[in-house]
Amino acid sequence: MVSRDFIFWEVDVQADFMLPGGKLYVPGAEKLLPNIRRLTDAARQGRVFLVSHGDFHAPNDPEFKIFPPHCVKGTAGAELVPEALTDKVVRVENDAAAKIPDDLSNYQQILLEKQTLSIFETHHADALVQKLGNQAEFVVFGVVTEYCVSFAVKGLRERGRRVAVVQDAIETLNPEDGQKTIAEWQRLGARLMTTDQALSALG
């Protein structure tokens, strides 16, 4: 049975970030893949609903003035790694005309596309969080700690949701910045857990 107490929230687990040789590879990110798979397996098994989001950029995206080109939509680098995907995914483009399905129970996972660091700058993130309600705790994991993961954690907290972060399923670019970011999350009321703890909590 799908948990009513937890929702898993997966950030940018895409080939260009996660794999050596990726366009914006996060050193060490591939070491997270066993835990990413374990967390995603829980959604595959119908134990928890999985929200995922990722970068899906146009070739001339303005972000490429700040970061090297990465996760260009339609390229292999933009795709979620296999460990991060379930068998029943609904994908929602960042377009006002796109729709979140009325009944998410037909799916194990929803994948929201974004073009900026914050998922909450997209058309559908707020509506999805509203639809998911405020009973469940949102369990966040992925990359990168001090960028998109942090925007997700802070965005969920700003919307009054309880948040936990899976500390052995996130990766940072700069360890010092990562520690400061984690401390900020804790000040905002987010808690830390391990992959084992996240899975045990599902019962």
Residues covered by each model-derived region:
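Residues at the starts of beta-strands that form the adenosine-phosphate
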Residues: 5, 49, 137, 161-164
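Histidine-anchored nucleotide/phosphate-binding helix
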Residues: 36-42, 147-158
